[in-house]
């Protein structure tokens, strides 16, 4: 047997007992390998050690892949199972038995090969290493060769054989019905692509709540071993989750059901019949007892032809058609998981890949031939299809992550799912990046108000009235924060009956159904509504014109209801995404589908059929009487309007609950309330500082005359030339004695400027007894050295 060298560790290689080697189906070539677990080097712990987990958050294994030593990096998938995960089987009496296993720790991992640009891994470590590894274009399966619960034991690593059962490898969805039909805009115009991308940026992460059913043949195939079946289903779900993570969608397994006592529906080789039967069972039975978004049936039945899977297109979130069926067509269950992911893609609006689609890897999920290789990514076409599906509001169930009150399992802090008694859950302390959440306790940190949600910003609640979800279109309403919760309220719509599309329609549950839009959805761009004469055919009561079907008979429409029966259009494409016949006569064009349960060929409820009249169940009825929405908004207090459930909703910018306080005014009042006292304090402080400054300046002016002022004084007060004083005149002047000086310093007259000396002067007398004016004498005064200059008045 030719072997590939996948792990060269000579001292670990040893003969494996034949009794310990499991029989690997059709695996004629495999290499016995011993994965080596690499333990990370850790710094000395400075904090309280974390609780030890049975399965670590991150793992690394060393092995040689494709002749080169490689390190496999794995990260635990903590959210593989939904919090309300349950398992259902039937006892010998046919009674349903449902359990909620407390699976406290996960042994399912996803990852890649370190330093490889294109690689992926989906691995279970529950009992050794079991799963799938890809490296470039090479794909491998790995399985333990013994039942020992060891990872460093003998494993078989074998290549994905693309030649296995190639003759039976196709999906049953017919592409010919889709390439030019509703989804003909796979190659969308640039403007449309920009719109889709812009819309996706704002969308939250998608949650696909997944339910798997196995028929009685599968139960027998796995020797009626429920534990083994659970292990296989969880490995498949882990692989599917790995694929859809690339679309920012999380696939959470909410339940597994095994028909242990017999099949609950008729399963035949006709895949279409089996799909219809499973669809009805799901809507009438399963959905009433278990909440989920999509259900798939895995069957051991060999479907006719090359079909191994079938699903309804663009039906995710539909109560009856969000289903798919998959044949257990391979000995390797992960190949079956690839088909399960493929059929789920159809439910999400994806068509098969064709030549012009760009695939990041060798094979993508939506390739029509499902057996050639294991898919590892989605093509460019699939991504555009998926974005379009989300844009068309067909995916409402994907945006509702499980509510804590809906969770019945034991809460586990660190699984990144918000459960009862948890404020937040950001993963383990190593994984957590939320600064508001304490990862050890799943509680909000002290001093903070919130940790997540549209109404939480920087760990604080946003103010009431702040818009947390803008209106998407004219039939939508904006949602505002209430100031109490960190989460945005549920999506609300304008009251049913509000005019839309420039008066061509009326809103109904957030949509604006019009004949024009339905014709374009059916036949594509360039389609328009047929003449009213075509709609008169609905009064005939034939297969090509009717309002109801009763006991197989096509019932005619009344004249007033003719616009509410069969849909008639003109122009557009000749191909449709549904099986059936296209019938044209004159300018009238209609569609006769094989499956009438979807009602795509009939005028939709809520379509305008006259002034204040809408179609409801193929009858043209009075809108206000039907919707009961007349004057609803007048009953709302404050700045509120009525929504589609006749409840009062605050207008944009107005704070709940009374809608009387504007968010803008509220914010302004807060700003004013804070800034006004600060402004008053600032003004008071400024006045005090100014007065103190003025006083200090006045003192300096009084005590320290400036040189500039002295110069001005010398210029103004320079005496005129007078004749010299004669000695006899001097003798007549009154003698000046020190005792004659005044005891107090009077204020200088305002017209007298003071000269600043070079040294601190003593008190300067400015006036003497007597009123006779004495001219300034240049001759030094006897006291001039003591008192400086003397100014006489």
Curated annotation (Swiss-Prot):
Sites where the protein binds Zn(2+): 171, 342, 346, 352
Annotated phenotype, changing residue 343 to A: Abolishes prodomain removal
Disulfide feature: 317-397, 357-381, 359-364, 468-488, 632-642, 636-648, 650-659
Cofactor descriptive note: Binds 1 zinc ion per subunit.
Cofactor requirements of the protein: Zn(2+)
A biological process term (GO) from this entry: proteolysis
Domain Disintegrin as annotated: residue spans: 410-496
Transmembrane segments: 669-689
EC number: 3.4.24.-
GO function terms (MF aspect): immunoglobulin receptor binding; metal ion binding; metalloendopeptidase activity
Signal peptide: 1-20
Ranges in the topological domain labelled Extracellular: 196-668
Active site (catalytic residues): 343
CDD domains reported for this sequence: ZnMc_adamalysin_II_like
Membrane topology: Single-pass type I membrane protein
Subcellular location: Membrane
Ranges where the EGF-like domain occurs: 628-660
Function: May play a role in organogenesis and organ-specific functions such as thymic T-cell development.
Protein name: Disintegrin and metalloproteinase domain-containing protein 28
Natural source organism: Mus musculus (Mouse)
